[in-house]
């Protein structure tokens, strides 16, 4: 991978990691269209550390408050004594399903599930689910139901969204896409669903990134070009990712996810068309 490819893929990762359109799908599709090699699941996981840094910086106050209250709660013998401590434990519990499924289906995630047929199917499938979630939310609001804020998220919400997050292991589904969809079904406001989605992503993205970095370390340092490319892509993804978080949270305050639904349907259909005409290889 040369420096130009690294910058482009870093921008793509940063733009698409937090928008509900799947970063993994775009990191798979764009190299295929450009005639580049598939960067692979390991590259995707490592570069996500850049977008992880974006979440840490953007939500610095929230995260420090959560960590501080979790530690204080343990020391005082009241682990669930505050809202922030409770949120920390809910995030931890919500991370368990994706860790289990990620380990169980590790080989499939890194190989067969990266087929463009799977990716296009996931893009279209989640778009349809998100459409249903939006329509349900519209009906709920019409009936006078108040959408939940961060303070109203309970254990049931956290565990169900955590379980739903496991679907994001399928390339093309989108981690933020599936968790936001799950949040809407559970009567979270769009902004709250996105905010909780980003916080919930921290443990699993960190674990996946560190694991792949450890696993691929010898290969990375064997070539200075590979090392520089990954560093550049990670830094770029972090900078662009920060802007993406700010944009999405502000956008969802007054807009639905319709634009992302339409984009997913068009992209998924376009990939299927290119596969059918031989313009793209499936693997």
UniProtKB/Swiss-Prot annotation:
GO terms for molecular function: undecaprenyl-diphosphatase activity. The chain crosses the membrane at residues 40-60, 85-105, 113-133, 153-173, 193-213, 227-247, 259-279. PANTHER family: UNDECAPRENYL-DIPHOSPHATASE. Bacitracin is thought to be involved in the inhibition of peptidoglycan synthesis by sequestering undecaprenyl diphosphate, thereby reducing the pool of lipid carrier available. Catalyzes the dephosphorylation of undecaprenyl diphosphate (UPP). Confers resistance to bacitracin. Belongs to the UppP family. This is Undecaprenyl-diphosphatase. It comes from Chlorobium limicola (strain DSM 245 / NBRC 103803 / 6330).
